């Protein structure tokens, strides 16, 4: 009987784990919405209409040391040069979400 209960419990836990979406899926969706509203005006499809060489492509992010969540969160929060700071417009969670979205899109080549 105990073996049966263990089997049922393990099966149940397995099914629950496969039905639950990844923890960051919602954050990425939120990040996409934030990006569309606040970032896409200058960074449409990962480009940069102000400074073409400072785009959001994976290679460029790596070149400038911006290929981590922390680095992207810092520049979104504080801004730099022509990039506006968003610390007064976005919550910390929104900044984290948009940073995750940018990294995910860079990995996918903004496709």
UniProtKB/Swiss-Prot annotation:
Compartments (UniProt record): Cellular thylakoid lumen
Post-translational note: Binds 1 heme c group covalently per subunit.
InterPro entries from the UniProt entry: Cyt_c-like_dom (IPR009056), Cyt_c-like_dom_sf (IPR036909), Cyt_C6 (IPR023655), Cyt_C_IC (IPR008168)
Residues where heme c binds: 39, 42-43, 83
Gene Ontology CC: one annotated term: plasma membrane-derived thylakoid lumen
Signal peptide: 1-25
GO MF: electron transfer activity; heme binding; iron ion binding
Keywords associated with the record: Electron transport, Heme, Iron, Metal-binding, Signal, Thylakoid, Transport
PANTHER family: CYTOCHROME C6, CHLOROPLASTIC
Family: Belongs to the cytochrome c family. PetJ subfamily.
NCBIfam families membership: Cytc6PetJCyano
Protein known as: Cytochrome c6-like
Organism: Nostoc sp. (strain PCC 7120 / SAG 25.82 / UTEX 2576)
């Amino acid at each position: 009987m105990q073996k049966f209960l263990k089997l049922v419990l393990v099966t149940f836990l397995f099914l629950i784990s496969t039905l639950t979406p990844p923890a960051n899926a919602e954050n990425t969706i939120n990040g996409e919405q934030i990006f569309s509203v606040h970032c896409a005006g200058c960074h449409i499809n990962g480009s940069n209409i102000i400074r073409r060489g400072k785009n959001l492509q994976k290679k460029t992010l790596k070149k400038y040391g911006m290929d981590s969540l922390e680095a992207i969160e810092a520049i979104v929060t504080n801004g730099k040069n022509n990039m506006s700071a968003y610390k007064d417009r976005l919550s910390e969670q929104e900044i984290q979400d948009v940073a995750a979205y940018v990294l995910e899109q860079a990995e996918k080549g903004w496709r």
